[in-house]
């Protein structure tokens, strides 16, 4: 399964990292899709990707744009995000499933 995770509020938490590790161990193809700006905010994102073993080719920055277009283009089947607006847009505009997470 093709699964994607947001960074802020998801992969930058212990719970989000643990879920991503479980999905990877399960054989899922995991991507990172973040609204962060690649030029200014990429180092932390790439560090998380390295820690999880996610290749840089599966890290996508939308640079403040909605994530649903990237999710649709990549054929992502499940996306985890903490932003309700992004969650709703994914559900409204794609065939992908999404889960709204609230991690500490």
What are these language model-derived features?
Residues 26, 52-55, 74-75, 93-96:
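Short, structured coil segments at secondary-structure junctions
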Residues 71:
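Helix-boundary and membrane-interface capping/anchor signal
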Residues 1-65:
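Alpha-helical substrate-recognition element adjacent to the catalytic core
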Residues 76-104:
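Acidic, Mg2+-coordinating phosphoryl-transfer loop and its flanking beta/alpha structural elements
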Residues 2, 75-76:
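Hydrophobic/aromatic side chains embedded in well-ordered alpha-helices
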């Amino acid at each position: 399964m093709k699964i994607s995770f947001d960074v802020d509020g998801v992969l930058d938490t212990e719970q989000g990292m643990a879920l991503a590790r479980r999905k990877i161990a399960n054989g899922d193809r995991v991507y990172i899709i973040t609204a962060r700006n690649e030029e200014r905010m990429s180092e932390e994102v790439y560090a998380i990707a390295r820690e999880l073993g996610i290749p840089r080719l599966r890290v996508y920055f939308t640079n403040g744009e909605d994530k649903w277009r990237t999710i649709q283009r990549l054929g992502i089947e499940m996306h985890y995000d903490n932003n309700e607006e992004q969650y709703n847009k994914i559900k409204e505009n794609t065939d992908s499933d999404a889960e709204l997470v609230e991690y500490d």
